[in-house]
Amino acid sequence: MPLVYLRMIIAAALILIVNQAGAACVWKVTSGTNVLYLGGSIHALKSQDYPLPAAYNRAFDASDRLVCEVDPKALLESSKGILKAGQYPKGDSLKNHVDPRTYDYLRRVFRLLKVPEGEFARYRPWFLSLMLQAPELHGMSETLGVEEFLIRRARANSKPVSGLESAREHADVFLDLTDRQSEAMLLMMFLPAERERSSSGDEMARAWRRGDADTDTRIMMDEFRNFPSLGERFLTDRNRKWIPKIEGYLQSGKTYFVVAGAAHMGGPNGIVALLRGRGHHIEQL
């Protein structure tokens, strides 16, 4: 191969790398003259993660409406429903729904945390898992998450905000878990790989910052590798359910900015790939 062509190929590759390095987890979707924007979110961030990549503000400014995973007005209702459903009815206990070895292990863990058995045993395993994953326990804040930032901007600019899921649909993601799935969700917190990878939140934030939704999806799916049905439930199934709604937004005549967790955007079963597979043109910003 002549040296000049080799140099041209290397130069083109470098340009591609530089362009990719400057990308954000924001995509422009077009279908004919219709336009929609997708934004990958990290639900909880740190103050040093600001300012957000400029593409988020550009997509917001170009849009008429903002769509999050759940309508913010319904989120409080959903949270109340999840809190209520996360507790067993009076007379029932966690002990009756998990393997005895799991219960004994949890009893030791919560004893170290100085939590009485009567307190933690009131809750279903999936709810205990949510409690242990609370961002505030890991130095992050949901009030600094991407959605919260954009919701505040939407309110300040009188832009309508809606959700891909209703309060009930969002709550049902957890409420319809079987005892086995619920126990698996909690056990994930105590697997050696999970304990060793305590910085996964930071790793996901770094991938999101450089526009690498595929890595965010991989991290999430790796967490579910021992319990693949949970990965299907929390990511893949919801992605597929959202596609008809997103296509409806795209054909509505209005410009929507649809924001969901970055892990929903990447991978072969992510929103970006699913829309591209249906013939829509997608450009990462």
Task: Go through the PLM ranges and name each one.
Residues 229-285:
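A cross-kingdom marker for long, charged
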Residues 1-10:
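Bacterial N-terminal signal peptides that target proteins for export
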Residues 22-234:
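Structured, acidic catalytic/metal-binding patches in enzyme active sites
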Residues 8, 30-32, 251-252:
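Short hydrophobic "helix-edge" motifs at membrane interfaces and signal-peptide entry regions
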Residues 18-20:
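N-terminal signal peptide c-region/cleavage motif recognized by signal peptidases
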